[in-house]
């Protein structure tokens, strides 16, 4: 039982799976997370992963599923194992947004797997990924570094009108106003 729209996770580019899952997604008015791998596994080549994502998006459209209901996971790889993993992920995310106009998601902590100071790396990656067009991420909202990076990236990208979320998270009214709070500060200026 759920409220809103169901989200079917991990639909890969395997033809057999697409023909089974996509009709069910359409029938139930669900959205789908498209995973950028197929029968051959996960390619390290970002062009191959993009092509698989494009195939899934096109196949979904053939079944009447709108692009807005397809969220692509470009499969972020660990930078400790693949030196160019960050550049590859950012390239794919940018192309998915610009060329296909789809929403994206990723397991953000995959990027830092096996490395120290994972929150620091994940924060840097997330800020850059948002800049490239990432629209959602699976991450730990309890890590302050990650939250700061996401909120900051949203400010930089113009996704936080009037910096409302940033201010709501970080403003300390009493300290910003010399201990008088917001109202005290305003009154102090009018005297």
Identify the meaning behind each predicted range.
Residues 1-4, 17:
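Terminal amphipathic helices with adjacent charged low-complexity linkers/tails
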Residues 5, 20, 25-178:
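Catalytic alpha/beta core domains of metabolic enzymes, predominantly
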Residues 10-15:
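Acidic, His- and aromatic-enriched active-site or binding-groove loops in soluble protein domains
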Residues 179-191:
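Arginine-glycine-rich low-complexity intrinsically disordered regions
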